[in-house]
């Protein structure tokens, strides 16, 4: 199932005191939607106007919304929860509530597929603590927020092992930070049963998700061109990988709380 959009102006709306921040979310979804041609900004406008505060009112956290810079038909967002049971309760409340009932047809009309969803948890305590959560502009803003988020899905042969996570902490993360990433976070597959089966998630696979926030697109390009990852990380990482990683360059929407 879907729901997405974008909107906002230049009046800041602070994240409420009751809202959790990235490191307070033991359960996170990475949601990637494939849209009909020309419909991404239509969905972003709707999402940012109607589906941010109304979801958070049910106890979840909309962590960030993004355009995939290399896939014009892709909208990507992150959503966090306090637990799997909290996820069930929040999603039941939202998807059975008046906001979704009023806008679901418009949202669904933009989408080809909304089932590409990874259910994740922080890879270790504090692994997501570096992700910033900024105050949002008021609904009505357009364009984009600063920075670019490099999101890489590493497909693994098995669940992330202590040895892999040690390599992640001491080789992968420092390489990104030396290469200009301002903030880095890591998630791995949450293996609990989907508590809200109305919204499917990808099952039967093991992943490590790396999020690296760069201040500018040029900074990410400079890191990529440096080949530091290819030299210092890729050879050591290869034995854990089942196939080539998925790499996404994500531009925050105007109302994304996660941006540079």
Predicted segment positions?
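Short, surface-exposed loop/turn motifs that are enriched in glycine and acidic residues
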Residues: 142, 154, 158-162
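Short amphipathic alpha-helical segments
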Residues: 39-63, 160-188, 228-237
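Short intrinsically disordered coil segments
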Residues: 48, 94-96, 132-138, 169, ...
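Generic "edge-of-domain/loop-turn" microfeature
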Residues: 40, 86, 124-125, 161, ...
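Short, well-ordered beta-strand segments in beta-rich or mixed alpha/beta enzyme
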Residues: 28-34, 64-95, 116-117, 146-156, ...
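A short acidic/glycine-rich loop-to-helix N-cap element
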Residues: 42-45, 105, 220-224
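Ordered, small/hydrophobic-rich secondary-structure cores
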Residues: 2, 13-89, 96-98
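Glycine-rich beta-strand-turn "strand-cap" elements at beta-sheet edges
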Residues: 2-25, 61-73, 101-145, 182-207, ...
């Amino acid at each position: 199932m879907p729901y997405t959009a974008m909107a906002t102006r230049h009046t800041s709306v602070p994240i409420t005191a009751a809202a959790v921040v990235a490191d307070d979310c033991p359960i996170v979804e990475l949601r990637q939607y494939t849209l009909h041609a020309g419909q991404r900004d239509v969905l972003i406008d709707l999402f940012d106007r109607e589906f941010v505060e109304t979801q958070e009112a049910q106890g979840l956290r909309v962590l960030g919304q993004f355009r995939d810079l290399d896939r014009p038909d892709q909208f990507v967002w992150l959503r966090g929860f306090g637990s799997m049971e909290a996820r069930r309760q929040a999603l039941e409340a939202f998807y059975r509530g008046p906001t979704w009932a009023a806008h679901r047809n418009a949202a669904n009309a933009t989408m080809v597929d909304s089932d590409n969803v990874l259910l994740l948890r922080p890879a270790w305590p504090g692994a997501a603590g570096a992700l910033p959560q900024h105050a949002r502009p008021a609904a009505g803003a357009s364009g984009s927020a600063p920075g670019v988020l490099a999101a890489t899905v590493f497909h693994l042969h098995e669940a992330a092992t202590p040895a892999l996570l040690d390599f992640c902490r001491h080789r992968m993360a420092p390489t990104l930070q030396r290469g200009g990433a301002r903030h880095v976070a890591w998630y791995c597959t949450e293996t609990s049963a989907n508590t809200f089966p109305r919204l499917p998630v990808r099952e039967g696979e093991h992943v490590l998700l790396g999020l690296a926030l760069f201040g500018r697109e040029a900074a990410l390009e400079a890191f990529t061109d440096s080949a530091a990852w290819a030299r210092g990380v890729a050879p050591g990482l290869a034995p854990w990988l089942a196939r080539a990683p998925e790499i996404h360059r994500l531009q925050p929407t105007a109302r994304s709380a996660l941006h540079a």
